[in-house]
């Protein structure tokens, strides 16, 4: 397979310091926008109206300049432009798979929340009836799941809510998903039908170890006056941070996905080391108690198919037994290889037999079609260049 790569800016530009640059308002919550307006002296009596105007232009219209905001007074636009921008984070690379999947490597400049440059990957997966954006919630990951490429990258920091939301703004910019605006690269479509219909927190990081920012991000993503994504089309995937599950359900109303991958603790301890802290029985009880779980809002259990490891008929039957009483569907994921891994994907016939056992027991058990494998954009393949970036920064500091 081949893929095309768009280099937005030279990688060497990573060493520039953007900490002193004007702050961007793109990605802020309503409270954040209101605080910015107060900074430039906007009257408190106008705060609600002015915040609503900014919200509409940033999130509904995708404005890239304050000059685009035609119903905002020229005086206010000038004041905003003197202090702030609507700039997006830097796109280091964009890769387009032969199947249409796109992967962006995004660089975040230092900010008030963090003095570190950082990079993450996010992925857009177009399909016939939907378009799914897979977003990252952390730079690197603490969980070291043995089958996951991200797990080989050291944890650097949490992403802010603004940085999470910026991933969607960038995607909508690039593919032309804001009404009336052409794609930034000329390759997308702005025909009027929404291109990003679903958001999945299945990129880099464990969302529940960054829950406050994930909660704020979901509130912006689902706001009906802006990005307007249904909470039923927002899925948060977790390896099983059991104490945080009730809070996730109560504060977001998002759909839940569990990275299960094994039906016995001794194996899951290896595949998902977090299991040593929160074993399968505790995790599944938390799922039974998850706020809002029902046949209409089923919990998705993700199960990566590893050859000779977790793919036997007895594993399938045990999975069915474990999930009894939980409104669930099982997403079977053919393992996606990455450089240095020792795992292999189960054979197609083995996956089909596993799926049949689960399906015949009454559970939906779709086999996920791998997308973006040729650009390392498929499930479990994401890993940013942040480690190299940190090394370059240290070299520059020593010069």
From Swiss-Prot:
Cofactor: binding comment: Binds 1 [4Fe-4S] cluster. The cluster is coordinated with 3 cysteines and an exchangeable S-adenosyl-L-methionine.
Source organism of the structure: Methylocella silvestris (strain DSM 15510 / CIP 108128 / LMG 27833 / NCIMB 13906 / BL2)
Required co-factors: [4Fe-4S] cluster
Record-listed S-adenosyl-L-methionine binding positions: 205-206, 237, 259-261, 336
Miscellaneous comment in the UniProt entry for this protein: Reaction proceeds by a ping-pong mechanism involving intermediate methylation of a conserved cysteine residue.
Biological-process GO terms, alphabetical: rRNA base methylation; tRNA methylation
Entry-linked Pfam families: Radical_SAM, RlmN_N
Protein name as it appears in the record: Dual-specificity RNA methyltransferase RlmN
Residue numbers annotated as active site: 121, 379
Highest taxon of source: Bacteria
Residues where [4Fe-4S] cluster binds: 141, 145, 148
SUPFAM superfamilies reported for this sequence: Radical SAM enzymes
Subcellular location: Cytoplasm
Major localization listed first in the record, in broad terms: cytoplasm
Catalyzed chemical reaction(s): adenosine(2503) in 23S rRNA + 2 reduced [2Fe-2S]-[ferredoxin] + 2 S-adenosyl-L-methionine = 2-methyladenosine(2503) in 23S rRNA + 5'-deoxyadenosine + L-methionine + 2 oxidized [2Fe-2S]-[ferredoxin] + S-adenosyl-L-homocysteine; adenosine(37) in tRNA + 2 reduced [2Fe-2S]-[ferredoxin] + 2 S-adenosyl-L-methionine = 2-methyladenosine(37) in tRNA + 5'-deoxyadenosine + L-methionine + 2 oxidized [2Fe-2S]-[ferredoxin] + S-adenosyl-L-homocysteine
Family statement drawn from the similarity comment of this UniProt entry: Belongs to the radical SAM superfamily. RlmN family.
